[in-house]
């Protein structure tokens, strides 16, 4: 029976006899003495097989190779002074093997090098995903899975032991509802022609749990969305889902800050300062051009629409007159850091802005003598008074580069936000070890969907409006809050609607007829007739949170068996075709074109 894990052995275990199981990470033969680095999910420890000292272990030690599965029984010994390895937590000890038993070997050439000395990160991701069971043996991936486990354990302990939450499972097979991304649909065999949907979130069920009196609910919930994938998206993902009755806006935020602080303390020994800063949606869009600001660095946007509104340069004045904006991204020392080539057509910053919908980037460079360099059309139409006001408002000093966005407000914001991120990273303004949390509040209830020519809920249609704005729901602020870490949203929630008449008004505002609302959400509306308590909640993207904590670039590196950006599993070759008999039982016929 195993007595210890490899990575747990320390000086206090010296002279103890231990039984270990694991994989051979490396094997080295030094003049007849064989050294094996034995690896399990906790780390590596050095095994010594000396034919003079422990002859019974030598033959199997000699026969072992990388990734062989072995059992080791031996005595923990102190390494000699010159042989200690400060890079390993177990580096002060080694195990002299009394017996080594090979439990299984490797019968094919390894498609991925697993050893801690190999640079596994350089292996193509497709190969890593195809042989994920080997990829997960690597030290980095094993640590990521352990971190994820520790985070979830911390969440559970805080919510259950400290805050009296109940963990309740909600259905995976439910009904399709409007709003949000496309659903994954499941045909019903026993109800031909009817379909289930896999849940995009447990939203409605957790609100019904509040009606039921389960006043503090949480769940580590699996969720599904059939949408185009990015680096931080998966078709199936995991949330920490929470809902609470009888708590105010500020009380919910306070509880969640304490939760986040506990997670970072338990998982990484990091003490966070609270309360976290708060910023309104309007302020975030104005200063950062987005609703998920990265506050680790400055470079805040400055609105100069009023200064250039009457300017002869039509790109600026025309944008303002058509209802748009002109904003500036001031970059101190930008003259030296950023050449004209990069902000003119074909340059990387120019292209980044264009990808976000902008037509280009106008610029002004402030010289050492206070004069400006820019294109003639700006210089010829900028009065001295406008120039001075522009430099004063942006705080521009000698050496500052001013980059302008002009046009529709959303395009100006998106393009300058993108350029700001690129410049901040390139100029070394971002401390990768810094953790900047910020709450974004006072979101609009609705945004306009130009394709469908209607309002739609910015978050979801169950978010409570600010009581001060009930007279005009179309322009109301929501009692919503997003928590952002280093420019990435890790969670979001709101106080909920709990009165039928308010919920019906919201449905009307987003264009749902009374019949449609009753058909799709009648069960919720009826529940609101039976004494529904005030409530609110939040959901965290567990994958994104762990990705940030592990300082990985993709959530695929913190998920055991992720899908590719084409929503496929290279390990199991899913999705795949099914037998026609199965389709017939489900009364489903495929209209997809035949594969080549």
UniProtKB/Swiss-Prot annotation:
User: Which InterPro entries does the annotation name?
Assistant: Aa-tRNA-synt_II, aa-tRNA-synth_II, aa-tRNA-synth_II/BPL/LPL, Asp-tRNA-ligase_1, Asp-tRNA-ligase_1_N, Asp/Asn-tRNA-synth_IIb, AspRS_core, GAD-like_sf
Q: Which Gene3D superfamilies match?
A: Bira Bifunctional Protein, Domain 2 (3.30.930.10), GAD-like domain (3.30.1360.30), Nucleic acid-binding proteins (2.40.50.140)
Q: Name one Pfam family in it.
A: tRNA-synt_2
- Primary localisation category: cytoplasm
Q: Does the keyword Ligase belong to this entry? A: yes
CDD domains of this UniProt entry? AspRS_core, EcAspRS_like_N
What is one Gene Ontology biological process annotated in the Swiss-Prot or TrEMBL record? aspartyl-tRNA aminoacylation
Describe the reaction catalysed, as an equation. tRNA(Asx) + L-aspartate + ATP = L-aspartyl-tRNA(Asx) + AMP + diphosphate
**Which top-rank group of organisms is this from?**
Bacteria
One molecular function GO term is:
ATP binding
Which residues bind L-aspartate per the record? 179, 225, 459, 496
Where in or outside the cell it occurs: the entry states: Cytoplasm
Protein residues bound to ATP: 225-227, 234, 489, 541-544
> Keyword set for this entry?
Aminoacyl-tRNA synthetase, ATP-binding, Cytoplasm, Ligase, Nucleotide-binding, Protein biosynthesis
The EC number of this protein is: 6.1.1.23
Site Important for tRNA non-discrimination — annotated at: 30, 82
Segments for region (Aspartate)? 203-206
> Which GO CC terms are listed, alphabetically?
cytoplasm
Function statement: Aspartyl-tRNA synthetase with relaxed tRNA specificity since it is able to aspartylate not only its cognate tRNA(Asp) but also tRNA(Asn). Reaction proceeds in two steps: L-aspartate is first activated by ATP to form Asp-AMP and then transferred to the acceptor end of tRNA(Asp/Asn).
Similarity section: Belongs to the class-II aminoacyl-tRNA synthetase family. Type 1 subfamily.
Quaternary organization: Homodimer.
Q: Which HAMAP family match?
A: Asp_tRNA_synth_type1
Instruction: List the PANTHER family hit by this protein, alphabetically.
Output: ASPARTATE--TRNA LIGASE, MITOCHONDRIAL, ASPARTYL/LYSYL-TRNA SYNTHETASE
**Record-given protein name:** Aspartate--tRNA(Asp/Asn) ligase
Q: Which organism is it from?
A: Picosynechococcus sp. (strain ATCC 27264 / PCC 7002 / PR-6)
């Amino acid at each position: 029976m195993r007595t210890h894990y490899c990575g747990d052995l320390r000086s206090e275990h010296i002279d103890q006899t231990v039984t270990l199981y694991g994989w051979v990470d490396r094997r080295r033969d030094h003049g007849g003495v064989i050294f094996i680095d034995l690896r399990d999910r906790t780390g590596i420890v050095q095994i010594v097989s000396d034919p003079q000292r422990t002859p019974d272990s030598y033959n199997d030690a000699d026969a072992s190779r990388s990734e062989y599965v072995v059992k080791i029984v031996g005595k923990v010994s102190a390494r000699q002074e010159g042989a200690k390895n400060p890079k390993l937590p177990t580096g002060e000890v080694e195990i002299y093997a009394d017996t080594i038993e090979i439990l299984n070997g490797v019968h094919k050439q390894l498609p991925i090098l697993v050893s801690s000395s190999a640079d596994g990160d350089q292996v193509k991701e497709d190969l890593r995903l195809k042989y994920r069971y080997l990829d997960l043996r690597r030290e980095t991936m094993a640590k990521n899975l352990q971190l994820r486990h520790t985070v979830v354990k911390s969440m559970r302990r805080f919510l259950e032991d400290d805050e009296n939450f109940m963990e309740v499972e909600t259905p995976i097979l439910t009904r399709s509802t409007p709003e949000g991304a496309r659903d994954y649909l499941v045909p019903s065999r026993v109800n031909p022609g009817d379909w289930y949907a896999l849940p995009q979130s447990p939203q409605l069920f957790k609100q019904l749990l509040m009606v039921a009196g389960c006043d503090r609910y949480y769940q580590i919930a699996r969720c599904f969305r059939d949408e185009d994938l990015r680096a931080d998206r998966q078709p199936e993902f995991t949330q920490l889902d929470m809902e609470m009755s009888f708590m105010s806006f500020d009380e919910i935020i306070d509880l969640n800050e304490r939760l986040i602080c506990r997670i970072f303390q338990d998982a990484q020994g990091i003490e966070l300062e609270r309360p976290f800063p708060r910023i309104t949606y309007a302020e975030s869009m104005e200063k950062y051009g987005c609703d998920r600001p990265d506050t680790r660095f400055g470079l805040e946007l400055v609105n100069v629409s009023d200064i250039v509104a009457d300017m002869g340069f039509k790109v600026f004045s025309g944008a303002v007159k058509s209802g748009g904006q002109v904003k500036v991204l001031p970059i101190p020392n930008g003259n030296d850091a950023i050449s004209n080539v990069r902000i003119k057509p074909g340059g990387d910053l120019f292209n980044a802005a264009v990808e976000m919908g902008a037509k280009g980037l106008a610029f002004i460079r402030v010289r050492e003598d206070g004069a400006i360099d820019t294109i003639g059309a700006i210089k010829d139409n900028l009065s001295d008074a406008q120039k001075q006001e522009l430099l004063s408002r942006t705080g521009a000093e000698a050496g500052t580069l001013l980059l302008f966005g002009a046009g529709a407000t959303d395009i100006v914001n998106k393009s300058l936000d993108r350029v700001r991120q690129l410049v901040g990273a390139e100029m070394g303004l971002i401390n990768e070890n810094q953790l900047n949390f910020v709450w974004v509040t006072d979101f609009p209830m609705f945004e306009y969907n130009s394709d469908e020519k209607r309002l739609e809920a910015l978050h979801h249609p169950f978010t409570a409006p600010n009581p001060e704005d009930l007279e005009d729901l179309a322009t109301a602020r929501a009692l919503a809050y997003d928590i952002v870490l280093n420019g990435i949203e890790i969670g979001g929630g709101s106080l909920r609607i709990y009165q039928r008449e308010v919920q019906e008004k919201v449905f009307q505002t987003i264009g749902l007829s009374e019949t449609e609302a009753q058909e799709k959400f009648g069960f919720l509306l009826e529940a609101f007739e039976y004494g529904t308590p005030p409530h609110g909640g939040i959901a965290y993207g567990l994958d994104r949170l762990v990705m940030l904590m592990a300082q990985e670039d993709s959530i695929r590196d913190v998920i055991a068996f992720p899908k590719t950006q084409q929503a496929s599993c290279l390990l199991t070759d899913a999705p795949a075709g099914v037998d026609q008999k199965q389709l017939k039982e489900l009364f489903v016929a495929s209209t997809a074109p035949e594969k080549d």
